[in-house]
């Protein structure tokens, strides 16, 4: 059984396709989605989203929070990933991501949630891009 994935942001559809498995980081921990999964709604963390394609290779994206909604209808399992922003690994400029990380770290303080989120996103982008 496969999972039909739709990775979207408010601006665009980032990726759509069938996968064997989805691995996502929720705010309460990791979740794995296979075919015939029970309905589920998960709040996503700023983190990598991993999708195992039908040929066994992995497609990785970074998502900036959002939600993962899993539904099953007539034997079709669908995973809708609704993120504030998302990028596939091959779309990330590693040098630019490192520069953004350094900028965010320089602005970050213990009390600044926005800067902490920027640091988390920059770190996730670097991890995803390799």
Language model segments and positions:
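Compact, glycine-rich, soluble single-domain proteins
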Residues: 6-98
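Acidic/glycine-rich phosphate/pyrophosphate-binding loops and surrounding catalytic core
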Residues: 80, 86-130
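N-terminal export/targeting signal detector
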Residues: 1-4
């Amino acid at each position: 059984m496969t999972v039909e994935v739709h990775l979207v942001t408010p601006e665009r559809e980032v990726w759509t396709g069938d996968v064997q498995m989805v691995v996502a980081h929720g705010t309460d921990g990791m979740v794995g989605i296979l075919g015939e999964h029970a309905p589920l709604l998960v709040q996503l963390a700023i983190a990598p989203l991993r999708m195992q394609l039908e040929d066994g290779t992995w497609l990785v994206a970074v998502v900036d929070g959002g939600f993962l909604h899993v539904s099953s209808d007539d034997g079709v399992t669908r995973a809708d990933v609704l993120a504030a922003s998302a990028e596939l690994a091959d779309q990330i400029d590693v040098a630019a991501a490192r520069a953004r990380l350094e900028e965010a770290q320089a602005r970050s303080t213990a009390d600044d949630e926005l800067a902490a989120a920027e640091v988390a996103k920059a770190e996730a982008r670097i991890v995803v891009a390799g």
